Amino acid sequence: MYAIVKTGGKQYKVAEGDLVKVEKIEGEPGSSVALSPVLLVDGASITSGDDLSSVAVNAEIVEHTKGPKIRNMHYRNKTGYKRRHGHRQPLTVVKITGIK
Protein backbone atom coordinates (compact mmCIF):
# COMPACT_ATOMS: atom_id res chain seq x y z
CA MET A 1 0.00 0.00 0.00
CA TYR A 2 1.33 3.43 -0.88
CA ALA A 3 0.19 7.04 -0.60
CA ILE A 4 1.10 10.33 -2.23
CA VAL A 5 1.51 13.15 0.28
CA LYS A 6 2.32 16.82 -0.20
CA THR A 7 4.72 18.54 2.18
CA GLY A 8 7.04 21.50 1.69
CA GLY A 9 5.56 22.26 -1.72
CA LYS A 10 6.58 18.87 -3.12
CA GLN A 11 4.80 15.54 -3.58
CA TYR A 12 6.24 12.25 -2.34
CA LYS A 13 5.18 8.65 -3.01
CA VAL A 14 5.55 6.84 0.33
CA ALA A 15 4.92 3.37 1.71
CA GLU A 16 5.08 2.09 5.26
CA GLY A 17 8.68 1.73 6.46
CA ASP A 18 10.17 4.17 3.89
CA LEU A 19 12.81 6.75 4.84
CA VAL A 20 12.10 10.02 3.01
CA LYS A 21 14.04 13.32 2.94
CA VAL A 22 11.55 16.20 3.01
CA GLU A 23 11.77 19.95 3.53
CA LYS A 24 12.44 20.87 7.16
CA ILE A 25 9.66 19.97 9.61
CA GLU A 26 9.68 21.46 13.11
CA GLY A 27 10.07 18.88 15.87
CA GLU A 28 12.62 16.85 17.77
CA PRO A 29 14.09 13.59 16.43
CA GLY A 30 11.96 10.71 17.70
CA SER A 31 8.73 12.71 17.71
CA SER A 32 5.73 11.74 15.61
CA VAL A 33 4.16 13.92 12.89
CA ALA A 34 1.18 13.56 10.57
CA LEU A 35 1.87 14.34 6.91
CA SER A 36 -1.01 16.06 5.17
CA PRO A 37 -2.61 16.65 2.74
CA VAL A 38 -2.84 13.12 1.38
CA LEU A 39 -3.47 13.28 -2.37
CA LEU A 40 -3.89 9.58 -3.24
CA VAL A 41 -3.96 6.18 -1.53
CA ASP A 42 -3.51 2.87 -3.34
CA GLY A 43 -4.56 -0.37 -1.69
CA ALA A 44 -7.12 -2.83 -3.01
CA SER A 45 -8.55 0.15 -4.93
CA ILE A 46 -7.30 3.67 -5.65
CA THR A 47 -8.76 6.36 -3.39
CA SER A 48 -8.55 10.05 -4.27
CA GLY A 49 -10.48 13.28 -3.86
CA ASP A 50 -12.94 13.86 -1.02
CA ASP A 51 -12.67 10.26 0.24
CA LEU A 52 -9.22 11.09 1.69
CA SER A 53 -10.49 13.24 4.57
CA SER A 54 -10.31 10.21 6.89
CA VAL A 55 -6.86 9.04 5.70
CA ALA A 56 -3.72 9.93 7.68
CA VAL A 57 -0.04 9.25 6.99
CA ASN A 58 1.96 9.09 10.21
CA ALA A 59 5.74 9.50 10.31
CA GLU A 60 8.54 9.66 12.86
CA ILE A 61 11.31 12.26 12.62
CA VAL A 62 14.64 10.44 12.34
CA GLU A 63 17.06 13.37 11.99
CA HIS A 64 17.55 16.92 10.76
CA THR A 65 20.22 17.30 8.07
CA LYS A 66 21.30 19.57 5.22
CA GLY A 67 21.18 19.05 1.47
CA PRO A 68 24.15 19.33 -0.90
CA LYS A 69 26.06 22.60 -1.26
CA ILE A 70 24.76 24.72 -4.13
CA ARG A 71 27.27 27.30 -5.41
CA ASN A 72 26.27 30.38 -7.39
CA MET A 73 28.65 32.84 -9.06
CA HIS A 74 27.78 36.46 -9.90
CA TYR A 75 30.06 38.16 -12.43
CA ARG A 76 29.90 41.56 -14.10
CA ASN A 77 31.96 42.15 -17.19
CA LYS A 78 34.80 44.73 -17.27
CA THR A 79 34.36 45.91 -13.65
CA GLY A 80 36.24 43.34 -11.60
CA TYR A 81 33.05 42.43 -9.76
CA LYS A 82 32.88 38.76 -8.74
CA ARG A 83 30.81 37.24 -5.96
CA ARG A 84 30.41 33.61 -4.95
CA HIS A 85 27.40 32.53 -2.91
CA GLY A 86 26.59 29.12 -1.38
CA HIS A 87 23.46 27.53 0.06
CA ARG A 88 22.56 24.29 1.85
CA GLN A 89 18.85 23.54 2.20
CA PRO A 90 17.73 22.23 5.63
CA LEU A 91 16.07 18.81 5.32
CA THR A 92 14.34 16.37 7.66
CA VAL A 93 14.57 12.60 7.32
CA VAL A 94 11.28 10.92 8.29
CA LYS A 95 10.32 7.26 8.57
CA ILE A 96 6.76 6.42 7.50
CA THR A 97 5.14 4.49 10.37
CA GLY A 98 1.62 4.03 9.07
CA ILE A 99 -1.00 4.78 6.44
CA LYS A 100 -4.51 4.60 7.89
Curated annotation (Swiss-Prot):
Q: Which GO terms describe its biological process?
A: translation
> Is this entry keyworded Iron-sulfur?
no
Is Cytoplasm tagged as a keyword? no
Q: Which GO terms describe its molecular function?
A: rRNA binding; structural constituent of ribosome
State a GO cellular component annotated for this protein. Answer: cytoplasm
Q: Which keywords appear in this protein's UniProt record, sorted alphabetically?
A: Ribonucleoprotein, Ribosomal protein, RNA-binding, rRNA-binding
InterPro entries attached here?
bL21-like, bL21-like_sf, Ribosomal_bL21
Described function: This protein binds to 23S rRNA in the presence of protein L20.
| Family the UniProt entry places it in | Belongs to the bacterial ribosomal protein bL21 family.
Q: Which PANTHER family match?
A: 50S RIBOSOMAL PROTEIN L21 (PTHR21349), LARGE RIBOSOMAL SUBUNIT PROTEIN BL21M (PTHR21349:SF0)
Q: How does it assemble?
A: Part of the 50S ribosomal subunit. Contacts protein L20.
Q: What protein name applies here?
A: Large ribosomal subunit protein bL21
